[in-house]
């Protein structure tokens, strides 16, 4: 992440956000106000941190607001405040966890917070994008969507305070423009850019020059079959990146066997470097952070794209939902026997919640990947107001010489949460 020179203003911005929320609290006609406090410990490499985080949630019909005041203290440095939490203006995302607005039955939607699993259109340019996987950085991003009859506009920026990834998507129902509503056929256009994208590393392995990366494309999909249980929709995308280009032809199928819902995607791809399918994906933030960090770099996206003879490749994605359980698995061929794979699982069983996320990047079957990432969090609620949690993350990577490095972090603690406006007890 690019560290902003305006970092000293970050604590003041956090204070102003909390003051505004406290002023709005008595006037908001909320369905639910809640307050929580977390206490815990965290380990990053050899550093031990003590966590204190109070938070406030306001839920209303038009908007939702979640604020936090996360404080981490270095247990090996006289419990001084962990400076990395407040060394950039973009760390405002630590305070404003969510500000969402929904008006006119969802015709306009706005979200401010840390962007996670963001996808545009068919996901051939922006697929599952996560703004930050750095435990010391939580940028404040924005995503907005406007629906005007048969036209839908969507825009996103990964960090409102920094020159990072931004883009937009336009979806159009062309038949509906000239007659009755027909929402089976869609035309899409997508534009995404990163003004300071990672470039090639120098010969000594250190950071090279950055450059603009601009990707754009058009797409078409048509739901040829749509019933209560089935939906089948072929699609086609044509995308461009400088001298590079790519074509995507795929099939989306949704099947409902209550309470189970399955979604399957099968996609054929043909690409010419420097274009790469799913360029802004779940691992892009890792590469970006590595690029701006000092020292030797792992294999960069730009170099990997240039080295792969893309030609023909494919992708398979499966999603399953059944009540409190959901899972998504993706396997994508990258050319030259290289693959990307990821899996996401969310489960709820009574007072217990579990979330698991894993990804392998640029791997051959039977060989180590260039990068591997695993995240997991478990949460258990007890005694009505109390809960405990355990979270852990592992990042593994290879540099150009084949040397491996790993970053492991974990945290655990307890918290208490209670309603500020509990519902009245029913009359007996």
Show the residue positions of the predicted features.
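Signature for the C-terminal beta-barrel architecture of outer-membrane proteins
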Residues: 32-34, 47, 59, 64, ...
């Amino acid at each position: 992440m690019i560290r902003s020179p305006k970092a000293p203003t970050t604590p003041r911005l956090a204070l102003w956000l909390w003051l505004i929320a406290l002023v709005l609290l008595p006037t908001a006609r909320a369905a639910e106000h809640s307050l929580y406090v977390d206490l815990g410990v965290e380990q990053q490499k050899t550093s031990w941190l003590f966590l204190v985080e109070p938070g406030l949630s306001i839920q209303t019909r038009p908007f939702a607001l979640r604020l936090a005041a996360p404080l981490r203290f270095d247990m090996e440095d006289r419990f001084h405040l962990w400076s990395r939490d407040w060394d950039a203006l973009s760390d405002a995302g630590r305070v404003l966890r969510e500000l969402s607005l929904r008006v006119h039955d969802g015709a306009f939607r706005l979200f401010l917070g840390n962007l996670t699993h963001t996808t545009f259109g068919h996901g051939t340019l922006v697929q599952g994008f996560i703004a930050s996987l750095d435990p010391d950085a939580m940028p404040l991003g924005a995503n907005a969507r406007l629906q005007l009859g048969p036209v839908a506009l969507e825009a996103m920026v990964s960090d409102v305070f920094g020159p990072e990834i931004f883009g937009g998507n336009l979806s159009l129902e062309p038949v509906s423009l000239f007659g009755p509503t027909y929402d089976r056929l869609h035309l899409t256009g997508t534009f995404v850019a990163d003004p300071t994208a990672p470039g090639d590393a120098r010969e000594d392995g250190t950071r090279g020059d950055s450059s603009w990366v601009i990707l754009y494309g058009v797409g078409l999909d048509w739901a040829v079959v749509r019933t209560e249980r089935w939906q089948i929709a072929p699609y086609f995308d044509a995308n461009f990146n400088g001298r590079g280009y790519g074509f995507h032809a795929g099939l989306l199928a949704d099947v409902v066997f209550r309470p189970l819902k399955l979604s399957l995607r099968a996609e054929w791809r043909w690409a010419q470097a420097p274009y790469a399918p799913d360029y802004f994906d779940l691992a892009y933030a890792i590469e970006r952070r590595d690029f701006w960090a000092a020292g030797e770099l792992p294999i960069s996206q730009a170099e990997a794209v240039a080295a792969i003879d893309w030609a023909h490749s494919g992708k398979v994605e499966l999603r399953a939902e059944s009540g409190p359980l959901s899972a998504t698995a993706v396997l994508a061929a990258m050319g030259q026997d290289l693959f990307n794979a990821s899996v996401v699982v969310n489960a709820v069983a009574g007072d217990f919640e579990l979330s698991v996320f894993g990804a392998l990047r640029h791997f051959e079957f039977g060989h180590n990947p260039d990068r591997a990432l695993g995240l997991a969090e478990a949460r258990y609620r007890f005694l009505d107001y109390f809960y405990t949690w355990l979270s852990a993350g592992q990042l593994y990577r290879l540099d150009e010489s084949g040397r491996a490095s790993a970053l492991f972090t974990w945290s655990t603690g307890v918290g208490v949460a209670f309603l500020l406006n509990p519902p009245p007890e029913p009359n007996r």
